[in-house]
Amino acid sequence: MTQFDKQYNSIIKDIMNNGISDEEFNVRTKWDSDGTPAHTLSVISKQMRFDNSEVPILTTKKVAWKTAIKELLWIWQLKSNDVTELNKMGVHIWDQWKQEDGTIGHAYGFQLGKKNRNLNGEKVDQVDYLLHQLKNNPSSRRHITMLWNPDELDSMALTPCVYETQWYVKQGKLHLEVRARSNDMALGNPFNVFQYNVLQRMIAQVTGYELGEYIFNIGDCHVYTRHIDNLKIQMEREQFEAPELWINPEVKDFYDFTIDDFKLFNYKHGDKLLFEVAV
């Protein structure tokens, strides 16, 4: 059993037993297959904590870990909102939100790529500012990135689910706290928890810090009603030991990472489970 499997199952059980239904409301989300309302059971304010002795990835089902890393590179490294760039990587998880111009509007990578921070007399984006400050001002309590821009929320195809990171350097270790306003526990959460831990490992490597703690906070923590049956199956499955994530130690610049610099060894997992997408 991994740390992630244990915490994940605990949250799913809480939602199943105590979750509040939104069926009395007219909800925004619709099922991609038939356009009917996609209702949920939800609880609020959940936290997952990991000591980074193992990589947080589910073993009760197969997680498309390379796809998760490719999405991470698209947002954080390319700082892109162009879905066609993601499609070139063989990833189509954002196709349902692609607008006529081929983008997701002013969301995710668009916000990270805006040059809105002052650094030594020039404007830089949030990622470059973060990397510089972690190296040169480690004791700062302002190591924050923010995707939730109220001025541009109406220009986004989908407002960000994971919207904030805060980084801490303590005794030579890099700690990361992530905040998600909303998390679909069947599809979104397994991707997000894994990929932001990969981000922590990447940035720790290029800034020269050891890995510290990883904290993942969720505001609205929910399960879609059509996902309940398969989640019950998943929770009864055998759990395995955590795999080993290898990141190419030769990479010293954040922008030099490619998908080939990541390998996952000994990933034992249950069979893939299909969960319908709500949009």
From Swiss-Prot:
Gene3D superfamilies: Thymidylate synthase/dCMP hydroxymethylase domain. The active site is at residue 161. GO terms for cellular component: cytosol. It catalyses: dUMP + (6R)-5,10-methylene-5,6,7,8-tetrahydrofolate = 7,8-dihydrofolate + dTMP. One of its GO terms (biological process) is methylation. DUMP binds at residues 141-142, 181-184, 192, 222-224. It is an enzyme of class 2 (transferase). Pathway: Pyrimidine metabolism; dTTP biosynthesis. Transmembrane segments: none annotated. InterPro entries: Thymidate_synth/dCMP_Mease, Thymidate_synth/dCMP_Mease_dom, Thymidate_synth/dCMP_Mease_sf, Thymidylate_synthase, Thymidylate_synthase_AS. One of its GO terms (molecular function) is thymidylate synthase activity. Keywords: Cytoplasm, Methyltransferase, Nucleotide biosynthesis, Transferase. (6R)-5,10-methylene-5,6,7,8-tetrahydrofolate binds at residues 184, 278. Its EC number is 2.1.1.45. It is found in: Cytoplasm. Belongs to the thymidylate synthase family. Bacterial-type ThyA subfamily. Catalyzes the reductive methylation of 2'-deoxyuridine-5'-monophosphate (dUMP) to 2'-deoxythymidine-5'-monophosphate (dTMP) while utilizing 5,10-methylenetetrahydrofolate (mTHF) as the methyl donor and reductant in the reaction, yielding dihydrofolate (DHF) as a by-product. This enzymatic reaction provides an intracellular de novo source of dTMP, an essential precursor for DNA biosynthesis. Homodimer. This is Thymidylate synthase 1. It comes from Bacillus spizizenii (strain ATCC 23059 / NRRL B-14472 / W23). The lineage of its organism: Bacteria, Bacillati, Bacillota, Bacilli, Bacillales.
